[in-house]
């Protein structure tokens, strides 16, 4: 049997590293961390005690190929504090959001996409 410890990181394909770094670093406010000197461009960010790795594949597109927000599509989830505060922050930066404050789960959800169409769910323990 495999004995899993924890999720270590999530890797996402991006097409424009500067644009992705602006979104993840400036808009979402994730702290960028040191990255080994790989032979391809990318960036690493801290997500609490986990990591997000952005990887550039020149000349290709990301998996989805669209920026439409679809909660049923592949996505990763980040738990945040303050539903309204998070929503206000995203909207003040012009980020399109799909709100699900009340749903079948026990946590309020906000879905967004990054500039390449990767879906991100931000959820909170409870509605403010």
Predicted regions and their residues:
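Exposed loop/turn and edge beta-strand positions of beta-sandwich/beta-sheet ligand-binding modules
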Residues: 39-41, 72, 106
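Mid-chain, well-packed structural core segment of small domains
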Residues: 69, 75-88, 92
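Short, charged/polar surface micro-motifs in flexible loops or helix N-caps
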Residues: 48-52, 59-61, 83-85
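N-terminal beta-strand motif that seeds the catalytic metal site of vicinal oxygen chelate
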Residues: 1-18, 73-78, 126-128
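Vicinal oxygen chelate
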Residues: 1-3, 87-128
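Core segments of cupin and vicinal oxygen chelate
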Residues: 13-52
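A short, acidic/glycine-rich surface segment
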Residues: 40, 60-65, 97-99
